[in-house]
């Protein structure tokens, strides 16, 4: 999939990011100027700080931006899933709304789908506190031990998917952390590339390290159960034996 030849949908969940959402969207739209067919689906997850109004105002002057809102707040998985289902593109790129993902990496993610169904970004040089890096390292190690997958950085939201593999996945709270694994159970081919990681443009994280780790471990048990019950098989149409006489 060479560069931006595909119709690309960017899906971005937002929760209380009034301090940075407009500059984040402005930077994203500039990065997408070389993509002839693109859209940005912004899903406000019941924000209470005026983010929704800022998004609606930005969308009014930028035709490529579509604004959706969840009411009440339903969580990051619900916001991602809503945007995924609304996306019109052949390729869906997921990213955060706090400015930590660099939209300049999107073109490389999309290009990598030429030989794969999913391209996961991993933060080669993390701009995080030591406690966050340690918590992430622990979660990734535990995940690899339990699920046996090879995803380097599950906490990096910047990922590109072929829409045909992503849209059929069933929604459940917490699923956004396991989308590559869930798609791989349907035969998806995954590649990974390094991406930039920056500090927040403004505002503060909505998660605590311990809370995120505990939820991930809990959800991982459910994914492991799904994985253990998955069987891969093919279906063929039986043909009559041409060597036998038919009365």
List PLM regions with ranges.
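Short, flexible, basic/aromatic active-site loop/helix in glycosyltransferases
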Residues: 116-167, 218-222
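Conserved catalytic core of Hanks-type protein kinase domains
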Residues: 86, 112, 145, 185-186
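Hydrophobic helical membrane-anchoring modules
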Residues: 1-4, 148, 172-247
